[in-house]
Design a protein with these regions (language model features):
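NAD(P)H dinucleotide-binding glycine-rich loop of Rossmann-like/cofactor-binding domains
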Residues: 89-175
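Rossmann-fold dehydrogenase core element
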Residues: 262, 274-314
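C-terminal hydrophobic helical "lid"/dimerization subdomain
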Residues: 3, 235, 247, 251-255, ...
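Mid-domain Rossmann-like dinucleotide-binding core that forms the NAD(H)/NADP(H) cofactor-binding site
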Residues: 138-223, 227, 239
């Protein structure tokens, strides 16, 4: 099968590898029909020390069940499914508490890896896979795009709002205008926020966020950005949703909150461990981590997409074939597309 690997910093390519095999009783082999490039993939893509042939970090997919392990009872060959980027077991303390993004049965992260390919092996599939009614041919391309967001970015945006306890009437600020930030805007609106300010410098992304439910955008950064947000909100925010993963983004998020505010962070951290002593005087609550993808999809996000209540698939502004994967990365890196979808026929 074809699989994407890094060839050098700033370049990816396809190689031929063996198809994955069932390795555990609760494994499933999927034939991928749609995958994509995530903003977090670009951290490795830009790494000057990346090794040629290093497996990429593509981790979002929807596909068809090809083969199942002997313990699988919830799906069968031919089923159409969302492959969450996390693989919760559904039975441990973390999963039962609704935090399957950090399942206790995994060492390190429980994320998918290398799914910019024709097939993938999905672990803990009996609980973690999310079945979609019907087949891909039953849906429009727009709907398939929205299903694909349910593998990561829509649940991740929702997770930021959930752990920040966004509730009806809240004033919310979203830091980050990529796909996760856009989905955080959707999530804040779903949870009843009265004002949603997106911090963004890019006109196309500003417009998308306004259409998703943002009530204002702020292009300024640093102290100027904080002052502008506070002017718009008439004070600090009740909740800030950090969707970037840099120290500057965290500082911005903390700066826009009023005393007693709440920070939800879902940007994968690319900074040294940050001391939280600075939040002491503000009584700031801080929470975040990998999203509870399976939990959110099964409880309400898949239904919201099927019912037409949300349309997060709009974040996929360009589509590519698997053979065009290098161009997809380049366009993401150069901000020519908000999120690149890969179509595999």
């Amino acid at each position: 099968m074809k699989k994407t690997v890094y060839t050098k910093a700033g370049q990816v390519g396809l190689v031929e590898v063996e198809r994955p095999q069932i390795e555990a009783p609760d494994d499933v082999i999927l034939r991928i029909v749609r995958t994509c490039v995530c903003g977090s993939d670009l951290w490795s893509y830009r790494n000057p020390e990346i090794e040629a042939g290093h497996q990429n970090s593509g981790h979002e997919a929807i596909g068809i069940v090809e083969e199942i392990g002997e313990a699988i009872t919830t799906v069968k060959p031919g089923d159409f499914v969302i492959a969450p980027f996390t693989h919760g077991c559904g039975e441990c303390d973390a999963c039962r508490a609704g935090y399957d993004g950090t399942c206790d049965r995994h060492i390190g992260t429980n994320w998918s890896d290398g799914v910019q390919a024709e097939y993938m092996r999905f672990e803990y599939a009996n609980w973690a896979l999310v079945k979609i009614p019907g087949q891909p041919s039953d849906y429009t391309e727009a709907m398939l795009k929205s299903f694909l967001t349910l593998a990561d970015v829509m649940p991740t945006g929702y997770h930021a709002a959930r752990v920040a306890h966004v509730k009806r009437g809240d004033k919310v600020v979203v830091i980050g205008d990529g796909a996760v930030g856009q989905c955080a805007v959707i999530a804040a609106k779903m949870r009843g926020a009265s004002q949603i300010v997106l911090m963004s410098r890019h006109e196309d992304r500003q417009q998308m966020a306004l259409e998703f439910g943002a009530t204002a955008v702020v292009a300024e950064r640093g102290e100027d950005g904080i002052a502008k947000v506070r002017e718009i909100l008439g004070g600090g925010a009740d909740a800030a949703l950090e969707c970037v993963g840099t120290a500057a983004a965290v500082d911005q998020a903390l700066g826009v909150l009023h005393n007693g505010g709440r920070l939800g962070f879902v940007g994968v951290p690319h900074y040294n461990n940050r001391a939280l002593g600075s939040t002491f005087a503000q009584n700031i609550s801080v929470a975040g981590g990998a999203a509870s993808v399976t939990t959110y999809d099964k409880q309400f996000l898949l239904k919201a997409v099927l019912d037409g209540d949300i349309n997060p698939g709009r974040v996929f502004t360009h589509s590519y074939s698997l053979d065009e994967i290098d161009q997809a990365y380049k366009d993401m890196n150069e901000r020519k597309t908000i999120k690149a979808m890969i179509v595999i026929e």
